[in-house]
Structures are given as C-alpha cells and as structure tokens.
Amino acid sequence: MFYSHTLLARKGPLGTVWCAAHVHQRLKKSQYTSINIPDTVDNIMFPEVPLALRTSSHLLVGVVRIYSKKVDYLYNDWNLLNTWVAKAFVSTQVNLPEDARQAPPESVTLPQALNLDEFDLEDDTLDMEFDNHTRSEEDITLTDQIPTGIDPYVAVTFDEDIISESIPMDVDQSTEPVSRHTGEIDVETAHETGPDNEPRDSNIAFDTGTYSPRNVTEEFTEVQDPRQSNLTEERIPNSERNDATSPGTVPEIERMRDAAHDLSPTSHPSFAAQQQDVRVERTESLDETLNEKEPTIPSIDEEMLNSGRHSAFELRSGSPGSAAGSEEERADFVHPSPQLVLQPSPPPQPQRRARKRKNFDGVTVLTNKNISERLKDPSDTLRKRKKMPSSKLKFWRMNNQSRKDQNFNEPLFTGFSDDLRNVFEKDYVASKPHLAVSDETLPEPASVSPTREAEVEINPVSPIPDSTNPDSTVQLSPAQQTEDVLDSAGPRPAHAESVATEAQSPRTFDNDDMGIEHLRDGGFPVYMPSPPPRSSPFRTDDFTTQSGNWETESYRTEPSTSTVPEDLPGQRNLGLSPVSERTDEELYFLEVGGNSPVGTPASQDSAALTGRARALAQYLKQRSSSSPTTSSHPSGDLSLSEILAGKTRKLAARMFFETLVLKSRGLIDMQQDRPYGDIALKLMPALFSKVQT
C-alpha cells in the first residue's frame, strides 16, 4: 500500500483532488470551487504521512485539472457579466422623428361596436350556378352499377341533369303510387295549370301556371309499358285531377327502393329509343308546401328541350320534403373524394427511455491507434532475447549461477577423488575430530603473550571461553594483536626475518566472509577449524585441542616467536596509543565475526548467541557504563545513529541485524518515535545477567 485511505477517501482532505485526477467528469461546479489550491498543494508536498511518488504525481494532476476548471468558470462568468452590462447600457443612437415612437390609436384599438351581421362572408352562391369544384354525376358514377334488364320496379335518381331535361323551371312535383295493371305501368302526375292547357305535339306536355290556394298540380304524360306496341295518350280531366289531389285522397308517398343505379338517358340510349309515351302525374299538398322550405327549381336548357331527348324512366318526384330526402340520398350515393377524408390520427408512440450517459476519462492511456501500431511493429515492446544454454558446459555454468551460495564449497579443479572432495565439506571434517592434531604432537609454545597471562591471572575459571573475553580475538583487531605482540616481544633472532611477512598477517579465517575475501586474492579456502601443522621450523602454533571441548568457529593463532618492529616496514610504533586505535576500530568485530554459537556444550544454554552477538552485547555494556552522559536520549538509552556515524553501509547492516538478534533474545529493547528517525537502544537486565564480562 503506497497511500493512506484516510487521505484519499471521498470525504478526506485529498479525496476531491484524487477524483479530479481520474473521474473529473463526475465532479460538480461546487466541488471544484470548494478546493483551496494553495492549501492542497501544501498538503501534497508536505504530507502528514509519507506518500509515494506515484501518488503525489496523481494528486498534482488533479490539482492542475481543478485549476483549469476554475479558470473556465471565471471566464464564463466574466462573459455573462459583460453581456448583462452591455444590455443594461445601450449606446446606440436612434434618429427617429418625434412622433414615430408612438403608434396611432386607430391601429391598435378595436371598434366599440362590432356588428358581425354586416360582414360579407361570400357564401351566398346559388345552387344552380356553375361551380368548377364540382363534377357531374356521369363523371363520378361507376359503369358497373347500370342494370342489364327491365325491372318493373325501376330505381330513379333525382339528379340535376334529369330535372333540367324533364321539368320546367316553375314546376313543383308530387308523387302518387304507381297503379299497376296487367302488361302496363301507369304513372300519373298532376300539374298545376293556368286558365288553359294546350296540348303539344310531343309526348310530354309542359303546362305552366301559378300556385292555387289549395294545392299545386302538375300534369305530365302518361307512362305506359314500353313493351306494348300501341301507346295512347290520355288527357286527365280537371275534375279527376281535383279529386285525385284533394286532401282526403292524397296517396301514400312511394319510397325509392334502389338508389344505387343511375338510369339517365345518356347512360341508356337503347331505352330512350324504345320509350314512346311517358305520363307522370304529380300532386302536392299546399300544407306540406307551406311547412317545408320552398325549393328552387333549376332552369331548363333550351337546347336540351329542342334536341327531343326524353327521360328513359321518370318516376314521381315527391314534395319538397321528399326532395330534400332525395338530396340526402343522392349525397349518400355519390362516393366522397378520398382526398377529403380525414386520416386517422397515428397511435401515440411510446416514449423512449433516456439513455444513461456513460462517463469516460477524456484522455485514454493507450489509444486504439497505439495498440494497433504495437501489434504491427512490436520492436519497441520486446526485450532482448536470452539464449538458453546449448552445451553441457553452459548448462553447468547456469547451474552454478543458480547455486551461488554453494559454489564456494566446491573445488575449483575437477578430477579429485572422493576423499579429496570430502575435505572441502564442512560437515565431514567436523564429524571426525580424531583426524585433528592431538596435544602430544604439538610442541610446547616458546613464549606466551603477556596479555593472555594477565587474563589467566585475573579470571582463572570462566564459564565463557577465552574467545569471548574483551581482550580475546573477538574483541581485538588484527592490528591490535600485532601491536600487543610487538610490545611484548623481545629481540628477534636473525633466522626469523625470512618469515616476518608471513607472521604479520593471519593465515586462518573465522567465517565465510573472510574466506571469500581470501578467495578473491587468489588463495584457497581453509574449512578445517584446526589447520594442519606448519612445516616452518622457526614457529609453532599454540592450539590446545581437546576432544571434549571442540570449537568449530572461534580460534586464534599466536606466533611463539615475536618479530622486531624495526625490521618490518610500515609497522613501526608512530606514538598512537591503543585507546585511540580502539576508538577508530570499535566495531571491528562485525567485520571478523562468527555466525555459530560460541562456548562449550556444557556452558551453552538454549539461547546461545553467536560470536558477533556476544561481542555486540559486550560493546553495548561497555559503552553504556563508560559514557552515560554522552547519549542524546534523556533516559540514558544508546543512540544507534551515533554508534553508526561515519560507518560503511555493510557495517551498519550487520550492526542492525545483530541488534535484532539481541532484541529477539530479550536482552535489549528498541524504540523509534517517528518513521525514518533515530532508534534508541535500551539495555535490559537480562543482558547483564546472561552475558558476563
């Protein structure tokens, strides 16, 4: 986790900035304006908890977007304010006359009395006037509706063309029932006539007159059966007409049986040729005439009268009321124009659901173009190919690289026998102590170091081996050991000059790190804790090996014969005291070190410490007792920063590791007040009881 949830939460101090860096489309204007940019930048640059560099970069991107949005909002507000100011203060000049700014009252005022009856709507057209918007019946009538045979019950339509051919202008029509006889059909129609009725030569007699106070009668020709060869025309006397037209003898009005057929003379010329005499009698009551609206009789065209054309079949026309009914029936007969029919309203369309808007980042990290280019040319994204080993030697080298920790335990030369291979194994030598050199084979040392003699006198019996004493090898550096030897040694014999260089540097190594350094110099590792006897007759080793007290890690060699410092170049005493050298190399035991526990099996407990850990414990005890006032902590704890001041990274890492070892054993306590701060070391009472001086 490289950031804290408390900082980047939605309601945290940097939550809005984090959202602006990733999902800035979801933020509102109020959220943008509520961010204080200087304070936010300070919180990012100097956070309460350390932030990763990646997190800080994301937050800075969010700050930039918030600042850009604020600039846009400010620019829009300024434009809006500028528009309002321009509208409020108009600077244009108007060059109009004085009275042009006001309209006259007449143009904006309605008249006081609005008489709608005086308006001319132009809709008082006559019924028989020529109208260009109306077609004739023949043009709009279908031809398949014409009957093909003669029917005694003939359907007649009262069309304008038929009326104009057969009826004079000032004639009212009345209807009587058809008197049916065998072989003929008589249709009588009474006309209202004047003082005299004059017969005509034609089969149709037209009589004109005025309306009588009682009734109106029209007389037409008698209609006979066209199938008879001899047709006679009879004149109906006035008395007979009067009796027929009396109120008590008014016949029942005949209703039209079929109005779907058009039987005009123009449609049936054959029927017009066969017909000879037509007699129609029409009567009408005056009361019905007064009650109904007076119809307007269209004028008769003279050309049609002179042409001699007659109606093929003319049934009685009724009263004005029946005429009005025929008007409705004729209107029903005529098919309406499909252009005038109102189209049905379309069904309401269901309202589509609003599509949810999807929010995406404005800029994508990898565009489609970039991905397609990488698929076509992946040279930029490919790394260098690692070749697999193709030979046994390369496989052997690869295996050695995978086992780096074990490579130094194997011989550099191949072809050794099993016994020689076992020599390079640590466990093999440690498991066979009888192969070590016994005490009888080693001669007695010629001289003993004064430092070791003083240690024996002070501490004759000690549960801890000599290697853990402050003056032992663990506590003294090689330079200090050489200094002690040079100070205590007497005059060196002349034959010892040949081995002076060999004696000034130790030939044995206590741990793997020193062995690795020796291998880098070109030497061979020494894995045996007890080296074989040296062949030089001028020095002997003071190894005291016991079968019951076998140490595998810490040992030291002291030459029996000392060397003269004047004969060794670079080893003269320059006047530096041992105390100053110890101050410079106070942590040298971390470089020499020992990783295995030190001590005999009888003296070791379950919490055995390594040589480095014990040396560090002794060092901390000495430093705590010698300089309690120099510590920077008021409680007297030691400061790890002061101890490692000026030391190398490798030495500091080892020091920290050994400190953790002591902490796990419960010998010391570590405390750190803040991250990346100083670490205080507090010595526990167990350190003074378990680790003896």
From Swiss-Prot:
Q: Does the keyword Cell cycle apply?
A: yes
Q: Where is this region: Disordered?
A: 167-250, 262-361, 460-511, 545-573
Q: Which GO terms describe its biological process?
A: cell division; chromosome segregation; megagametogenesis; mitotic cell cycle; pollen development; sister chromatid cohesion
Q: Where is the composition biased (Polar residues)?
A: 264-277, 465-483, 545-564
Q: What Pfam families would the database entry show? A: Rad21_Rec8 (PF04824), Rad21_Rec8_N (PF04825)
Tissue expression, as annotated, is: Low expression in shoots, buds, siliques, leaves and roots. Found in, but not limited to, actively dividing cells: in procambium, protoderm and ground meristem in roots, and in shoot and floral meristems.
Specify the domain of life of the species encoding this protein.
Eukaryota
Q: List the disulfide bonds.
A: none
What subcellular locations does the record give? Nucleus
Major place of localization? nucleus
Its cellular-component GO annotations read:
cohesin complex; nucleolus; nucleus
Q: Which family does it belong to?
A: Belongs to the rad21 family.
Task: Report the function annotation for this chain.
Answer: May be involved in sister chromatid cohesion during mitosis.
From the Swiss-Prot or TrEMBL record, give the protein name.
Sister chromatid cohesion 1 protein 3
Q: What is the lineage of its organism?
A: Eukaryota, Viridiplantae, Streptophyta, Embryophyta, Tracheophyta
